[in-house]
Design a protein with these regions (language model features):
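Scaffold/interface architecture of coatomer-like assemblies
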Residues: 1-191
Length: 191
């Protein structure tokens, strides 16, 4: 059976507890309609009270960039995000030493909308493979099985990646200009 269509779990909010609650309910799984989810995020968004008419829009994608079931294409969602001034950031779930067919899509989505991709799992798995290939008393016990250390390292890496993105978002400025050539007013122009 095809995967279910994307659903809006939490609309625009200034309550982080609502986001955390939904994030805790997420389950990892294979396959999905990433581009359809981006399309929905770019088109279905409520304004909050006191928010400017054209607020800053940021989308953080946590995953490997693979899309297996979308009705929309990568090109469609890129154009939509660019026209709606949506900056896309990625938090890659690809582990150190592994690849993903969707990784190029995640990079493209981020770079072509002014964002970037974080790789939180690289450091965790790099350290673990380092401990295995260069055994030492200290290294062998760095992430001890059954202690929760591994899960803690994963959570810490993911948190640090999202915090780095949040820090970058809060220290950016938006510049706009009115083009002289108005033949194609909806065309995205790169500065």
């Amino acid at each position: 059976p095809p995967p279910p269509p994307p659903e809006l779990a939490v609309d625009t909010t200034n309550r982080p507890d609502k986001l955390v609650e939904k994030l805790e309910q997420l389950k990892p799984g294979g396959g999905g309609a990433l581009y359809d989810a981006i399309y929905m995020a770019c088109t279905r968004r409520s304004l909050m009270k006191g928010e400017p008419i054209e607020p800053r829009r940021v989308l953080i994608i946590m995953g490997d960039g693979t899309d297996t079931a979308s009705e929309h294409t990568l090109e469609e969602v890129l154009e939509l995000a660019q026209r709606n001034l949506v900056t896309i950031y990625g938090v890659s779930t690809v582990a150190y030493g592994f690849g993903s067919t969707g990784e190029a899509n995640l990079i493209r989505l981020a770079e072509e909308t002014g964002g970037r991709v974080e790789y939180p799992l690289e450091g965790v798995y790099k350290d673990i493979t380092g401990y295995i290939s260069k055994p030492s008393d200290e290294g062998n016990y760095a992430i001890k099985v059954g202690t929760g250390g591994y899960a803690t390292e994963l959570a810490k890496s993911l948190f640090e990646s999202v915090a780095a993105i949040a820090g970058e978002i809060t220290t950016q400025y938006i510049l706009r200009y009115v083009p002289k050539n108005t033949d194609s007013p909806k065309a995205f122009r790169k500065l």
